[in-house]
Amino acid sequence: MKKVRLGIIGVGNMGSGHIGNIVADRCPEVEVAAVADINPDRLEWARSALGDNLPCFDNAEAMMDSGLIDAILVSVPHYDHPRYAMEGFQRGLHVMVEKPAGVYTAQVRQMNEAAAKASVVFGMMFNQRTDHVYRKMRAIVKSGELGAIRRTSWIITDWYRPQAYYDSGAWRATWSGEGGGVLLNQCPHNLDLWQWICGLPVKVDAHLHFGKWHDIEVEDDVTTYVEYENGATGTFITSTGDVPGSNRFEITLDGGKLVAEGGKLKLWRLGTPEPEFSRINTVPFGRPEITVEDVPTDGQSLQHVGVLNAFAGAILRGEPLVAGGQEGINGLTLSNAMHLSAWLGRPVTLPLDEKLYYEELMKRVQTSRRKENVQAVVADTSGTYGTR
């Protein structure tokens, strides 16, 4: 069997998780051919997992120039995602990027333009697109059977993190290291799913609290209101300070309501779409007939393994990706807009003013408090990325 020779850049939480999946033979068409990390302890760990003969590099460019790999998986701090992706494109390597696509959209736009010029496969690690509930939810919305979207609401507060999480790396939860908090670290999956299913809004009014629940400088509590081109509205609420948290994604449409919660999808279907019912009904307190359904799904949620297997299939046979790399800019547009709205203290419109966003971000980077004397900790992330 032909295999994709993968080089992993960054052997931290996510990089080591991918290695674990590949070692367990969950990705039969992928082999780890080399790894790169600036931390010698992580290279030693990789050798212990993959064998003493594993080619290890302390320089990602050297690994990319080695001729040992066909593709790279970029799993490093956020600011460097576009940089290494573009280095890969220049060398004709296929590229898979961990979320988020980057920190600011102007940077990611450059990455996308470079990808368009390269004849390679470019994917994003949006593993939650493999979730059976969200796939089914999107299929129903996109089919048009329930009509136009009227309202969206996502309460996603089960991203709880204790202070120890933020203390596990000097770059964590800093403007200079991560470029943001819960929106850029935990919620890229949710923001991607929100726009993947409902589309991008045209107006964003966000209220962010910075270091509300933790000793950090970035946001850990968010409440956002959005408006869509068709007049629909939406809310997005998230936090890393709630325990227990909630995860309820609700979409109201002309013909009913979809609710994703607890790994299940429910549908409240109207016998007559609301606009038509309101027009023809003559009873002052009349209501359309409503039926409630538990929506069946295929039950499959292949997560990171599914994304990597699709990546290999795209390289070897031209099969579709779970998420094309160019799509990473969409969810990032939402988080950038939320940050900018909060910083300016007013709503912002899309398309985003990328220059203004970058200027405001750099103000915060210049005064960022880089943590010192921090002992980096690599944690087991398995079980933390399921239905969200």
What positions do the PLM features span?
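Predominantly a Rossmann-like dinucleotide-binding segment in NAD(P)-dependent oxidoreductases
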Residues: G10, Q128-I216, G345
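Beta-strand-loop-alpha-helix segment that lines the small-molecule cofactor/substrate pocket
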Residues: A71, P77-R129, G144
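Glycine-rich phosphate/pyrophosphate-binding beta-alpha loops
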Residues: P188, W213, I237-G245
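N-terminal Rossmann-like dinucleotide-binding module
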Residues: M1-G51
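Short, well-ordered coil/turn residues at beta-beta hairpins
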Residues: S75-V76, I237, L253
